[in-house]
């Protein structure tokens, strides 16, 4: 009987992600797409949007040398990490106009029309997803960065060329950078 329990426990543990980010635990995100220019690019936040490989976020941070965004999940909603009572909150516009646009609003601002706040999750592979789908990166954005989009069934979101699906790998932050990110 004990051997059966041991095998069950081992199988259960093997199915769990290695670095699972718990609710409200701060984390960073790295883009994964083998053989691509976006491979291992850190995710950034600036001008009310999300990017990969942006050289400067122009954010006000506790550690200004760290140019990566720090996030946390709470009940399916995704926030930019801050010690404010009203942190910046992400939204996704999957409408025909938004085509999967990911943005964020400052403080207590409402989401724009068609903006969805909930639907964020971390899957069993430790990938950040929206609506159960991986994210999309499109090249040639500001400062040579890649713009990040939710999968809304549009191959070229925002009419961008060269877009690629990415796995947005979650990495738990041991020393999270507290920032206030720029809005548009």
From Swiss-Prot:
Q: Where in the cell is it found?
A: Secreted; Secreted, Cell wall
Does this entry carry the keyword Glycoprotein?
yes
- State what induces this protein: Expression is highly induced by the V-ATPase inhibitor bafilomycin B1. Expression is also increased by the anti-fungal factor phenyllactic acid (PLA).
Keywords for the protein's UniProt record, in alphabetical order: Cell wall, Glycoprotein, Secreted, Signal, Sporulation
Q: Where is the signal peptide?
A: 1-21
Main localization category:
secreted
Chain positions carrying an annotated carbohydrate: 58
The answer to whether keyword Endoplasmic reticulum applies is no
GO CC annotations on file:
extracellular region
Q: Name one GO biological process term.
A: sporulation resulting in formation of a cellular spore
Q: Briefly state the protein's biological role.
A: Cell wall protein involved in development of asexual structures such as phialide and conidium development, and thus required for spore formation. Plays a role as a general stress protectant produced by the fungus in competition with antagonistic bacteria.
Q: Which family does it belong to?
A: Belongs to the phiA family.
The name this protein goes by in its record: Cell wall protein phiA
**Gene transcribed to yield this protein:** phiA
């Amino acid at each position: 009987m004990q051997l059966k329990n041991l095998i069950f426990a081992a199988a259960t543990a093997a199915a769990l992600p290695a670095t699972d980010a718990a609710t409200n635990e701060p984390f960073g995100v790295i883009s994964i797409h083998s053989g691509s220019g976006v491979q291992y690019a850190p995710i950034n936040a600036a001008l009310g949007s999300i990017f990969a490989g942006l050289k400067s976020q122009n954010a006000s941070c506790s550690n200004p040398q760290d140019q990566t965004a720090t996030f946390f999940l709470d009940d399916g909603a995704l926030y930019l990490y801050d010690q404010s009572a009203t942190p910046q909150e992400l939204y996704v516009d999957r409408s025909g106009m938004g085509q999967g646009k990911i943005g964020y609003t400052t403080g207590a601002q409402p989401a724009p029309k068609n903006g969805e706040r909930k639907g964020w999750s971390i899957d069993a592979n430790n990938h950040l997803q929206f609506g159960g789908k991986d994210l999309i990166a499109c090249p040639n954005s500001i400062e040579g960065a890649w713009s990040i989009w939710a999968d809304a069934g549009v191959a070229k979101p925002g009419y961008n060329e060269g877009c690629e699906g990415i796995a947005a790998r979650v990495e738990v932050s041991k020393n999270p950078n507290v920032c206030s990110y720029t809005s548009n």
